[in-house]
Amino acid sequence: RMEQYLTSVREAEIRTTRADAWLDTPLPTISDADRQRTNRDIAQTMAGDYFRTVYDLMVLAFQTDVTRVATFSLGGEGDAFSIPEIGITESRHQLSHHGGDAGYMEKLTNYDTFAIEQFGHFLTRLTETKDLNGKPLIGSTMALFGSGMSYGHSHGNANLPLVFAGGTDLGLKHGSHIDFNKAAKDFAGYSLGPDGALTSAHYQLCSRPANTDAHMSNLLLLMAQRMGVETDQFGDSNKVIAI
């Protein structure tokens, strides 16, 4: 216990020293183009401009090494705003509780398509922007897009669809779709109904995963390790995903 106490004290000293050093670090110099693109007052009702501006700020922060970690929520799970520019006046939370309404489901699809397009803008900017070593920033950046729910109508939090990009300079390899359900012995596959829609068996996967060993925390553990964190555990992780 004494060793644990001394370790905690030393870690606190290191964090304090790092914070003190940061106070004396001069602000980075940025180009006029970057300043004009990011120094904007944009209302959230202009969702596209708002999303892209925040993504641009994240790219600029990574490029100038102001920070190496950033999180951007497109809106709270309960109050994600509407997107009037594509004809959506409802919040995403409202659309997710669609009750099978075809109009709501179409808007929900359009909402998610719009959101992933803005994430695509972020990846493009990372690809176009050079890091301090003159290499594309995307190579040293890991970008994870997703949600803690796979089916909002019933608050299903399993079988999460995630997009993981970047980090090739960190040894990551992409260009594949990894379906962890297929690794489960009793997984019978995905089935479509007569109308081409997914059956109720699919939606059950959103609450009861076929592969109970597939944890999102396994991916977060991989990301932490590739960032140099010396740890063998992240939350309820049980292995490191091989990518």
Predicted feature locations:
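Ligand-binding pockets and gating/stacking loops
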Residues: 1-243
